[in-house]
Amino acid sequence: MEPNNSFRVDSEFRYTLFPIFYSIVFVLGVIANSYVLWVFARLYPSKKFNEIKIFMVNLTMADLLFLVTLPLWIVYYYNQGDWILPKFLCNLAGCFFFINTYCSVAFLAVITYNRFQAVTRPIKTAQATTRKRGILLSLIIWVSIVGAASYFFVLDSTNREPNKTGSANITRCFEHYEKGSIPVLTIHIFLVFSFFLVFLIILFCNLVIIRTLLTQQVQIQRNAEVKRRALWMVCTVLAVFIICFVPHHLVQLPWTLAELGFQDTDFHQAINDAHQVTLCLLSTNCVLDPIIYCFLTKKFRKHLTEKLYSMRESRKCSRATSETGTEVVMQLKDVPVKSLKY
């Protein structure tokens, strides 16, 4: 099929959706991930980090990298898709978007494999010294993905095009593909198929974990609680993948074909609308990832529970004090004025 060069689609609802949605994700994500780092720094000396905690800290750092660029995207979409900031910030935002997406996928994958080993080979896993392996795997993930993302620093990321009224030109950020570009199509095919390969591995590992946990005989109540938390962790990881990453990668390849001009106009508009929604879903991983930590580490969960309990008790005390003060005032109203004089 020959590429169609004559039409440019736009999904105008995104200029309302993204500023609102990204603002919510930014606030919740910064609070949640900053709290995670603070708890880890307070509860765990760095030398005592095991493999799973190393992966969790790295996943949090990847989320924060993306979160710091969200204000840039909020400004961009608030200005109707016109990049008014310096050009290098567009490159930086695109780079951090790529890093967050695929570092999150990679670290969730190694976290899943770690839990898979712990369930299927508990004795060997308990005896293994995994700290060095955790550091090495994290380093490999960062070097590989940051190296791939460096392409976005040298890419010509912006392009000028007329606004919707045709009265002036606006600057787009990462919204232009050369029509019929085979290298661009090849890159996207590689990314999409690599993602689904990793997703199938994660799905297999989690299904094995679920089957193993459900077929185990629970002897004591404590083991039942551990089993319940493990099942919740598996469900949470799968939920993050299915909600955040799968929709985006299902749409990505058809959307790329449409952007390159290999699809008709009606399909292009429909897939572009869907693509905007999947970008929103993709950003929610920064908020959902911290939930996984509650099921992975006992200290983290205990600390969070204590803080929530403390806040609830503080509100009760505050309310009780307020009610007591009101009662005292009401009682004083019934006391004769003369009796209050010395």
From Swiss-Prot:
Which residues does the record list as glycosylated?
A: 4, 163, 169
Q: Which UniProt keywords apply?
A: Cell membrane, Chemotaxis, Disulfide bond, G-protein coupled receptor, Glycoprotein, Membrane, Pregnancy, Receptor, Transducer, Transmembrane, Transmembrane helix
Primary site of residence:
membrane
Which GO cellular component terms are attached?
Answer: membrane; plasma membrane
S-S pairs? 90-173
Please indicate which superkingdom the organism of origin belongs to.
Answer: Eukaryota
GO biological process terms held by the UniProt record: chemotaxis; female pregnancy; G protein-coupled receptor signaling pathway
* UniProt tissue specificity: Found in oviductal epithelial and stroma cells. Levels in the oviduct are raised at days 2-4 of both pregnancy and of the estrus cycle. In the endometrium, localization is predominantly to the apical borders of glandular and luminal epithelial cells. Expressed at lower levels in endometrial stromal cells. Levels in the endometrium are increased at day 20 of pregnancy (at protein level).
Membrane topology, Cytoplasmic segments: 39-54, 114-133, 206-233, 297-342
Q: How does it sit in the membrane?
A: Multi-pass membrane protein
Q: Which residues lie on this side of the membrane: Extracellular?
A: 1-16, 75-91, 156-184, 255-276
Any one GO MF term held by the record is: G protein-coupled purinergic nucleotide receptor activity
User: What family is it from?
Assistant: Belongs to the G-protein coupled receptor 1 family.
Subunit structure and binding partners: Interacts with ARRB1.
Function as written in the Swiss-Prot or TrEMBL entry:
Receptor for platelet activating factor, a chemotactic phospholipid mediator that possesses potent inflammatory, smooth-muscle contractile and hypotensive activity. Seems to mediate its action via a G protein that activates a phosphatidylinositol-calcium second messenger system. May be involved in the morphological and physical modifications of the oviduct and uterus during the estrus cycle and early pregnancy.
Name it. Answer: Platelet-activating factor receptor
Organism, by scientific name, is Bos taurus
- Report the gene name: PTAFR
